[in-house]
A protein has these predicted regions:
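Alpha-helix capping and helix-coil boundary motifs
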Residues: 1, 80, 170-174
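N-terminal low-complexity, intrinsically disordered segments
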Residues: 1-60
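Generic hydrophobic, helix-prone segments enriched in Leu/Val/Ile
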Residues: 32, 69, 170-174
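Internal, hydrophobic cores of structured domains that mediate oligomerization or house catalytic pockets
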Residues: 35-136
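Aromatic/basic-lined ligand-recognition segments
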Residues: 107-174
Length: 174
C-alpha cells in the first residue's frame, strides 16, 4: 500500500510484515527514492576489489551508468531475521521488475555488486536469496605473512554475527 508519493520518493507499507514495538505495531515501510545522477564516485579500489560477483563488468558499470535509484526498508529491524531476509529479497525482486532497464544492483550493507540480469534470472528460494545477494565473503592476504583471512559482511541487518576464518600456510586456490 502506497502511503506517500512525491517528486523525491515513494513509500509503501508492507502490510504483511508488522513491526512490533513496546508502544505499538505498524507495517514495515519500503522506500524508493527518486532517480538521481550517478557519478560512480566513493568506491575506492578496496571496495571494488571485493565485488566478486561482477569482476568483469564492475569498471564498465561505474564508468557507464549515469543514474541511480536508492531503495531501503524502514522499521524492518524489528522483524525476525528470517522474515526480514525474505522481505528484503522480495523487495529486491520487485525492484528488478519495476526497473527493467536497470543494469546493476549495489548492496551498500555488504559491498556486493550484481548485474541486474543475475538478480532477474536466479533460481534461489526463500531466505537463501538474502545470503546470495546481501552477504559478501571477502578475502584478504595478511601483509608480511603467508596467512589469509576470509570474513563476511552483510549479516548486520539481520542482527546476526559476521564470520571470520584465519588460515595459516594454506593454498587459497586448492
Amino acid at each position: 500500500e502506497c502511503f506517500c508519493y512525491d517528486k523525491k520518493m515513494a513509500g509503501f507499507a508492507a502490510q504483511e510484515h508488522i513491526a512490533e514495538f513496546k508502544d505499538g505495531k505498524c507495517p514495515v515501510q519500503l522506500m524508493v527514492m527518486k532517480c538521481d545522477k550517478f557519478k560512480g564516485k566513493g568506491f575506492d579500489a578496496f571496495l571494488m576489489s571485493q565485488m566478486w560477483d561482477c569482476q568483469e563488468d564492475r569498471e564498465r558499470i561505474f564508468r557507464e551508468c549515469k543514474y541511480q535509484v536508492v531503495a531501503t526498508d524502514m522499521l524492518a529491524a524489528a522483524l525476525p531475521a528470517l522474515e526480514r531476509a525474505n522481505l528484503d529479497a522480495d523487495f529486491l525482486e520487485a525492484l528488478a521488475e519495476l526497473y527493467p532497464t536497470c543494469e546493476a544492483f549495489y548492496f551498500q550493507s555488504c559491498g556486493k555488486l550484481f548485474l541486474a540480469e543475475d538478480v532477474r534470472s536466479h533460481q534461489i528460494e526463500g531466505s537463501d536469496r538474502f545470503i546470495r545477494f546481501g552477504v559478501n565473503v571477502r578475502f584478504f592476504n595478511i601483509e608480511g605473512t603467508e596467512d589469509m583471512l576470509i570474513d563476511t559482511v552483510g549479516m548486520s541487518p539481520l542482527f546476526l554475527p559476521a564470520l571470520q576464518y584465519h588460515f595459516h600456510n594454506m593454498a587459497p586456490n586448492w
